Amino acid sequence: MINVLQEKTYIKMNKCVLNFKNDLNKIRANRATPELLDNIFIDYYGTHTALSKLSNIIIENNSTLKISLFDISIKNSVEKSIINSNLGLNPISSDSNIRIKIPALTEQRRKDIVKIIKNDAENTRISIRNIRREANIQIKTLLKEKEINQDIEKQVKLEIQRYTNLFIKKINDILSIKEKELLTI
């Protein structure tokens, strides 16, 4: 029972960190990454479909993405979706491909993005602490129901606190790396 609780707590905390990391990967620095287009969807024969499912997206060079569509008939829809995505990207159409030149970030925009990711990091830390709180409540319930004794309660609470410290450190490390990446010209 306790092992399952510890394992579930670890898995939930790990998911929070992975989601945070995935969200940060979508935020661009001065490099073109295919993940930048992960949130672009196209209405493909009545189905809301991710661009990545309808094309190959490759890095052509440091500042250019190349989209090779599987179905050329959706090229106009893809271009409109990219323009309407509020990512500040302008697609350039050529034969069956679409190229996207990633514009350089201004210093002010970099600072704004850093503020946003710091806020996201804090929200992720709060989620980690809430998971810890939920686990501690479950531990107290088990103690009240006499399914565990006080020694086990203390051991498990310490272990969950170690998880909390570990994942908050991971969040801080990921944030630090992304912050340096964004502020480096």
Swiss-Prot record:
It comes from Buchnera aphidicola subsp. Cinara cedri (strain Cc). Keywords: Cytoplasm, Protein biosynthesis. One of its GO terms (cellular component) is cytosol. Responsible for the release of ribosomes from messenger RNA at the termination of protein biosynthesis. May increase the efficiency of translation by recycling ribosomes from one round of translation to another. GO terms for molecular function: ribosomal large subunit binding. Its main location: cytoplasm. It comes from the Bacteria. Pfam families: RRF (PF01765). This is Ribosome-recycling factor.
